Amino acid sequence: MKIRNSLKSAKVRDKDCRVVRRHGKVYVINKKNPRMKARQG
């Protein structure tokens, strides 16, 4: 999982990427390609 300042670039890397909020943190998840996971921080 990558830790990024901005998730905009992480979101557009793949069309299956989703932005979700969990426990006050923002994540990009991708069920089809888990290598695309990222967290904002």
Curated annotation (Swiss-Prot):
Coiled-coil intervals, chain numbering: none
A GO MF label: structural constituent of ribosome
Official protein name in the record: Large ribosomal subunit protein bL36
Protein source organism: Gluconacetobacter diazotrophicus (strain ATCC 49037 / DSM 5601 / CCUG 37298 / CIP 103539 / LMG 7603 / PAl5)
Statement: the UniProt record of this protein carries the keyword Magnesium: no
HAMAP family in UniProt: Ribosomal_bL36 (MF_00251)
Superkingdom: Bacteria
GO biological-process terms attached to the record: translation
